[in-house]
Amino acid sequence: MPEKRLTAEPPTITEEEFEDSLATDDFLVDYFNEFLSLPTFSEAIRFNADYGVFEVANDAPQFLEKQLKKILQNQQPRNPIYDVVRKGKNEVKPVQMNAPDEDETINVNYNIMCLSREEGIKWIKKERLPAFLESDCYFEYRLAKLVSQVRWSKSGMNFTVGSNFSPWIVKKPPSLPPPATEEDNLVIMKKFYVSLGEASYTQTKDWFALAKQSQQTVSTFSLPCCVPYNKLKSPAISSVSENFIFDDGVHPRTKKDPSKTNKLISEFEEEEGEEEEVSVSLQDTPSQALLRVYLEKKQDVDESLTMHFSTCEEFLSSYIYFILRGAIQQIVGKPVGETPDYINFNNITKVSFDDCFESIHGKNFLSELVQTTKERSEEIEQTSLSSKNESAGPESRADWCISHRTYDIGNRKEFERFKKFIKGTLGERYWWLWMDIERLKVLKDPGRHQRHLEKMKKCYLVSNGDYYLSAEILSKFKLLDGSQWNEEHLRNIQSEVLKPLLLYWAPRFCVTHSASTKYASAELKFWHLRQAKPRKDIDPFPQMATLLPLRPKSCIPQIPEIQKEEFSLSQPPKSPNKSPEVKTATQKPWKRELLYPGSSKDDVIEKGSKYMSESSKVIHLTSFTDISECLKPQLDRRYAYTEEPRVKTVSDVGALGGSDMENLLQSLYVENRAGFFFTKFCEHSGNKLWKNSVYFWFDLQAYHQLFYQETLQPFKVCKQAQYLFATYVAPSATLDIGLQQEKKKEIYMKIQPPFEDLFDTAEEYILLLLLEPWTKMVKSDQIAYKKVELVEETRQLDSTYFRKLQALHKETFSKKAEDTTCEIGTGILSLSNVSKRTEYWDNVPAEYKHFKFSDLLNNKLEFEHFRQFLETHSSSMDLMCWTDIEQFRRITYRDRNQRKAKSIYIKNKYLNKKYFFGPNSPASLYQQNQVMHLSGGWGKILHEQLDAPVLVEIQKHVQNRLENVWLPLFLASEQFAARQKIKVQMKDIAEELLLQKAEKKIGVWKPVESKWISSSCKIIAFRKALLNPVTSRQFQRFVALKGDLLENGLLFWQEVQKYKDLCHSHCDESVIQKKITTIINCFINSSIPPALQIDIPVEQAQKIIEHRKELGPYVFREAQMTIFGVLFKFWPQFCEFRKNLTDENIMSVLERRQEYNKQKKKLAVLEDEKSGKDGIKQYANTSVPAIKTALLSDSFLGLQPYGRQPTWCYSKYIEALEQERILLKIQEELEKKLFAGLQPLTNFKASSSTMSLKKNMSAHSSQK
């Protein structure tokens, strides 16, 4: 079984190696782009790895993509699957496909602002890199690199973790040797081991002259020695033995040519024949010492030569190349130059590799190989014809790995799948312990350092911790003793914490994505789908969430509701504004997990489905732990009777500071991902109130999360509330936030029992307080950013939709043109193959084979035809690149500014992953690496200018493809032959340039998508409004128009608030129980049907009734949160409604609307009754004569008994419900009157009361 060595030491990014790592490490690009686009920073920046430049975030590519998709949908026929109504045969019409006009052009170019390369790098290193190196983004990047080492193969893999093994060394070009610091004479003296002593100046001078003269012809050595010939390893003596013989310990040696050495040895063998041992004398040395090398008879070491390959494909490609090279050499008659990766299989007798083809019973191995080759070619074609954001999902990578019989975690999306895979397992605990150790290592402040250690103990050591580790694991890590929880010991065990992830969880993840898992039985797949898919509720009244997040996170950024359809594609220097508000969350609980659009979007969010986490635990959130651990409560059902469309309006953006406050909350939410950028600003400011307020906000979020667990723990809630009060609010608090004395007293009076709104006043106070440092930080960051020069660049969108539109456009061409295109297109798949290039020239007629590329340059007319030929086949980039470099070479050296500008232009346009370093590059991968080494390394791609030799080398590769590929295709075309016969046939076939490599699109990081999120300031404002008598009365009338039970829900919420005040008043327990009973009888278990008078799930109501005593003061917690979420949905609509009205007019307008709705319902009921009476009357008239029944139509037959069609109208149903409600209300009032009076009502009998009730009901009905 093959072995693979892994390292437990993650890569370390330094300022010196940052550029090289950013240019070569895709993981680093992903995480650094996520960091740069966080809402903490005033300007959203991203690094474009294709062009090697930092760009200002721009939504123009996504907007263009939507436009192209819309155009394509208009051009293509409608999919019949969407035709719900089945049409008759005569109604079906042939679908007409609207092909685009030939002259129609679609502009796929867009402008984007880029940071100046030199200034941008300096600004990034100064303003962003230090914070990144202390952020969770960097820690997760290091962990991702470690996990990415794991690789799965069918033949098995034995993993070993080594301490002295590091694969993270950045490849750099060989550096020049340092200049000699010693004088030449001193070096010569050391070489010859001489001391001149008291020699005269003349003698010394003559001796040095003689030594220098002898040094020019022969090599030196220290002592003569003998080396047996059989100890010399083939193919060259100079590899090991030469260093041993000639090294004098002072200066290095240069390796001799292996071919010459082999030739020398072979000559010795021929001369000596069968002698057992021979010797040969080499050249004399300056010190006149004789060197003799003793040679023994050479053994045939090639007999057992074994070559090892990592995969079977690698062996096949090498062997096929060896066979083809021999065939080409025999055909051409000339030796073909060797490449570095060439292997001579004549000397190899045995081949071994890690992975091999599995023997499949009943199938032909050759057919299987051919099928695999076809699939791979189709996959390569598909990848080259699709953008990365559409085809580079985790599934496509998984399919690629399976087709190659391997699997690894080699990109960000696979790593996100691995995170999801270990969620809820022991591997997740190892994960977060490793991350917490990383966080601990960067904390410099002693206070924060100690607090983080305490939080880690509570999380991992205490039995009720969120990530509690068993005693066996703690004993293994030597963490059972609390004194061992120190930074030094945690650093020592960090590699041991990582080993379970590398040796078990990561290989297990890879194995689950193997071919056997992919091709599992249909029954197993169906069972897994049913388990993973949430159960659909068949209840006609959908339930609301068990727990609605009143305060999920005070800072979760919103997803904008209003999407602008049109905007300028030219990006201004400033980044887009932040979203103006944050919405309220209604998603399942999740812990320590972030949602990325590029990560779990393809995995979990597909075709509009929302990501719902499976976890139900909650993380104890502090300012020194992962802020993204906040849970959100589970949504089992939605509310009933209140289904309303989402209103595209923003509510009260002025509350608590407006948009600035929302930006502050967004920043606080992602502080851990941003390296606590804002927190450090407050710490360094010297203002203790700012620093304490930030700490309080983080700890307060942890307190809020305790209310969103499935099982509320009153003891933990009480303990956390007391901790917050004692640490931040109390008069003698160590981290006092400066709250007013009245508010402190108010919090103290309500601290027993504590509810989720206990610290609302304190939270509102600190948010307003933190607005000042936030504004100062943003301004200072913008000042530094404005010093960087911005350059506008024009880009071209590479989209699948655009290619499909081009395909539709090509259908209008003639069949002959299509055949020509196909013929030429088939020969461009393998441009680097020598045999293909020979075949290109074989297709050229003999009379045109004398044409060279230089002839085209001299013939301007043919050169223009050649340019059009390349444009026709979307390959004009080669000629453009060659022309631009040629223009650069012809610029005089004196004109330095023009040469510099041209060099920068060439580098920005061609030296990127869209062209020269992409899949359609004119150079091979080895040649690309040689070019980058010549230019100084991959890190140089981030700088402005390249040297002239580099550009000349690039031009050589471009010209090589032009001469060997495109020129023979051009000469073999019919158009060229027709022009040579003076039959001019001009045909312009123009297409847009299609780049072969997809543009990397790393969108601005968004933690959540398609979720209702709301900040704490909106929740506080809404809660205040519900407690305000005037506002609550207006809102009550407003929601009464939206649903039948919404008004009751508002009253229920207010009654629960009164119950909370009653608990804080410390009154008698019997009074509190009586209040609970009253609320239950009125809203949850009413004697008047329906029993449940508010919009909460039935299970929730049953839980309140059955466990009212066990729940204690939190008996109505879940129900109140559910109602709050239902009502909060209509709060933005109400705010929009009352904007244009005065307080005096609001009630009158609402009353008129209510009256209008009633009249509308009455008219609908009357119309339904009238239509029903007419139908019955008509039926009676037509059914009297029995003879006429045969003449009745089918519609009237349907009205006969047992065949009558049931009619149902929603408006009539609503009216009936309203009537029932009124009658029940009248009955309730009468019952109150009956039991209110003593003497007068005791004489009444049941019959009389019943008669009066019926009379009143009938009277009320007649009035209606």
From Swiss-Prot:
Biased composition (Polar residues): 568-578
Tissue: Testis-specific. Expressed in Leydig cells and spermatogenic cells from the spermatogonia to spermatid stages (at protein level).
Region (Disordered) location: 565-587
GO MF entry, a single one: G-protein alpha-subunit binding
Record-level GO cellular component terms: actin cytoskeleton; cytoplasm; cytosol; fibrillar center; nucleus
RGS domain sequence ranges: 852-980, 1021-1145
Entry keyword set: Coiled coil, Cytoplasm, Nucleus, Repeat, Signal transduction inhibitor
Coiled coil: 1142-1174
SUPFAM superfamilies registered for this protein in UniProt: Regulator of G-protein signaling, RGS
Chief localization: cytoplasm
Localization in the cell: Cytoplasm; Nucleus
Cited Pfam families: RGS
A single GO BP: negative regulation of signal transduction
Entry annotated with the keyword Aminoacyl-tRNA synthetase: no
Top-level taxon: Eukaryota
Job of this protein: Inhibits signal transduction by increasing the GTPase activity of G protein alpha subunits thereby driving them into their inactive GDP-bound form.
Subunit structure: Interacts with GNA11, GNA12 and GNA13.
Protein name per its UniProtKB record: Regulator of G-protein signaling 22
Provenance organism: Homo sapiens (Human)
